[in-house]
C-alpha cells in the first residue's frame, strides 16, 4: 500500500531529507521532533518542560493533519540530553496522555541541536484496525 506524506500547514523546513510524518496502512510514523521554530532555531532554551510542550504540540499537529488525535499514539521514542530533565519532561508529557498511556522508551543521548533538551518520535494508529 502506498504511503501518504503528512506535512501540517506552517511546518518549517526540516534539518535533513525527511518529512514530519508518513501514513501507511493506517499507521502514522512521526519523525523525530525537536523544539524548533519555523526557521529551525531552538525555542525555550534551558527549559526542558517548555521544550517538551513545544515538541508535543508539533507532534499533535502532525497527528491531527493525518486525521487522528493524541489518543491514537501507540508508541513514543523519547531522547533527552540530560537525565536531570527527566522529571520536567514527564510532568508535561503526562498532561498530553491523561488516560491510557502509549508504550515508550526514553534514552539519554546527544541531540543534533546543542540547545535542544528533548526530541520525541511517535507512532500512531489512525484508521481501521490492523
From Swiss-Prot:
One GO MF annotation is:
deaminase activity
Catalytic activity as recorded in UniProt: (Z)-3-aminoacrylate + H2O + H(+) = 3-oxopropanoate + NH4(+)
Pfam families reported for this sequence: Ribonuc_L-PSP (PF01042)
- Biological-process GO terms, alphabetical: nitrogen utilization; uracil catabolic process
Is the Hydrolase keyword given for this protein? yes
Give the EC number: 3.5.-.-
What InterPro entries does the record tag this protein with?
RutC, RutC-like_sf, YjgF/YER057c/UK114
Name the UniProt key words of this record, in alphabetical order. Hydrolase
Q: What class of enzyme is it?
A: hydrolase
Its cellular-component GO annotations read: cytosol
Carries keyword S-adenosyl-L-methionine? no
Domain of life from the UniProt record: Bacteria
| Record's function text | Involved in pyrimidine catabolism. Catalyzes the deamination of 3-aminoacrylate to malonic semialdehyde, a reaction that can also occur spontaneously. RutC may facilitate the reaction and modulate the metabolic fitness, rather than catalyzing essential functions.
The entry's family comment says: Belongs to the RutC family.
Q: What is this protein called?
A: 3-aminoacrylate deaminase RutC
This chain's source organism reads Methylorubrum extorquens (strain ATCC 14718 / DSM 1338 / JCM 2805 / NCIMB 9133 / AM1)
Which classification does the entry list for the species? Bacteria, Pseudomonadati, Pseudomonadota, Alphaproteobacteria, Hyphomicrobiales
